Curated annotation (Swiss-Prot):
Keywords, in A-Z order: Cytoplasm, Hydrolase, NAD, One-carbon metabolism
A GO CC term assigned to this protein in UniProt: cytosol
Protein name per the record: Adenosylhomocysteinase
PANTHER family linked: ADENOSYLHOMOCYSTEINASE (PTHR23420:SF0)
Quaternary structure and partners: Homotetramer; dimer of dimers.
Enzyme kind, highest EC tier: hydrolase
Pathway: Amino-acid biosynthesis; L-homocysteine biosynthesis; L-homocysteine from S-adenosyl-L-homocysteine: step 1/1
Organism whose genome encodes this protein: Bradyrhizobium elkanii
Length: 473
């Protein structure tokens, strides 16, 4: 399977991998009932006809099913991965072979990563996208940073706080020189909205909304119950140990593991390690989450307590500098260190660059300290489940990506009479319950139905929604 004749608007590792990718996409479709039902329901209506979606989300087999669902609903699409290690090259090849522009290679450099992200906005024919589908907020951030600089505030471009920021700001400067005056403003004006996949990207959106700098409406897909309580929790429960095992081949049973953070991702990660036979410790700043961890039977400690005791360390906080170089100096010889939060700054990777690195295999490095003790770093502190394994299973991603599809429809087709202002919204409970319903039959669930008198008794409709908006699942 090769790309369509004359179609060259893609960058992938090897287009010859497309046949392999297509076979795996076919398998994934069977495990993604929500997306397939969405195609069947909305396909004839073409609600995304005219949508030009700039997508920045891990270019996996499951994402390929999402991309082709959006295309089946009428959208025109350009796509990049949101992480330098998360691309599955056969998935990217299959999408390119289908004639959809995609720019994603597993192991791309940071410079390549940001160059590819910029390609999202170089629409064929000289137009711009009118929708963003984001994971982590990098595509959204590029538009906002460029717009800010166009408005005359350029001082921040000379104050990078990391290697990646230096590369990112250099890209913004280059685009300001190369593109027509007001290019970023034109993009911002044309964007009808963004749907954001993950906790970290949502934080960025709320920060901008609170400051009044958000340039277009946003839907927070992450906080849909059928995303955060399934993808973040059950997805991590399956994929974390998969990444650690593929990366290291260590026996997990009997090991001491430390999980930093006990939100939904941390809960899933701790459960993953416990089910593998680890003795699990947890650190938390939130007293509620700390109490939850203790009530689940985990030992709640600080990272300082855990550093010399644990064999495996996992960060899952969405915050920075969770594991510092001081913590790593105190670790056992060949302790395993990894991250399952969105960005790599949860671990102080930059502070290790002047030490001796020995690459064991792709995304597995041994780092030696001056005292000769070593640690094993997975995926250079980036997402371990996608860098060292294949990410979450298709079924749980179907729920997340069905939410993404509904959010894109909502922002593009249903934003009548300025229904959505430049704020952050969540999908209504009715759609959350709909997404859940679409996945029940696949796993043999028989749902009990309320009688009218029962529904009246608890003050809900027979068809739902069954919980208030503030209900905590």
């Amino acid at each position: 399977m090769n790309a369509k004749p004359g179609f060259t608007d893609y960058i992938v590792k090897d287009i010859a991998l497309a046949d392999f990718g297509r076979k795996e996409i076919s398998l994934a479709e069977t495990e993604m009932p929500g997306l397939m039902a969405t195609r069947e329901e909305y396909g004839p209506k073409q609600p995304l006809k005219g949508a030009r979606i700039a997508g920045s989300l891990h270019m996996t087999i499951q994402t390929a099913v999402l991309i082709e669902t959006l295309a089946a609903l009428g959208a025109d699409i350009r796509w990049v991965s949101c992480n330098i290690y998360s691309t599955q090259d056969h998935a990217a090849a299959a999408i390119a072979a289908a004639g959809i522009p995609v720019f994603a290679v597993k192991g791309e450099t940071l410079t390549e990563y940001w160059d590819y992200t910029a390609k999202l906005f170089d629409w064929h024919g000289g137009g711009t996208p009118n929708m963003i589908l984001d994971d982590g907020g990098d595509a959204t951030m590029l538009v906002h940073a460029g717009y800010r600089a166009e408005q005359g505030d350029t001082a921040f471009l000379d104050k990078p706080g990391s290697e990646e920021e230096e590369i990112f700001y250099a890209l913004v400067k280059r685009l300001l020189k190369e593109k027509p005056k007001g290019w970023f403003a034109e993009i911002a004006k044309n964007i009808k909205g963004v749907s954001e996949e993950t906790t970290t990207g949502v934080h960025r959106l709320y920060e901008m909304a609170n400051k009044g700098t958000l340039l277009f409406p946003a839907i927070n897909v992450n906080d849909s119950v059928t995303k955060s309580k399934f993808d973040n929790l059950y997805g991590c429960r399956e994929s974390l140990v998969d990444g650690i095992r593929r990366g290291t081949d260590v026996m997990l049973s009997g090991k001491v593991a430390m999980v930093a953070g006990f939100g939904d991702v941390g809960k899933g990660s701790a459960a993953s390690l416990r089910q593998a036979g680890c003795r699990v410790m947890v650190s938390e700043v939130d007293p509620i989450c700390a109490l939850q961890a203790a009530m689940e039977g985990y030992e709640v400690v600080t990272m300082e307590d855990a550093a010399p005791r644990a064999d495996i360390f996992v960060t899952a906080t969405g915050n920075k500098d969770i594991i510092t170089i001081e913590h790593m100096r105190a670790m056992k010889d060949r302790a395993i260190v990894c991250n399952i939060g969105h960005f790599d700054n949860e671990i102080q990777i930059a502070s290790l660059r002047n030490l001796k690195w020995t690459n064991i295999k792709p995304q597995v490095d041994e780092i030696e300290f001056p005292d000769k003790h070593r640690i094993i770093m997975l995926s250079e502190g980036r997402l371990v489940n996608l860098g060292n394994a294949m990410g979450h299973p298709s079924f749980v991603m179907s729920a997340s990506f069905t939410n993404q599809t509904l959010a894109q429809i909502e922002l593009f087709a249903n934003n009548k009479d300025s229904k959505y202002a430049k704020k952050v919204y969540v999908l209504p409970k009715t759609l959350d319950e709909k997404v859940a319903r679409l996945h029940l039959a696949k796993i043999g669930v028989k749902l009990t139905e309320l009688r009218k008198d029962q529904a009246d008794y608890i003050g809900v409709k027979q068809e739902g929604p069954y919980k208030s908006d503030h209900y905590r699942y």
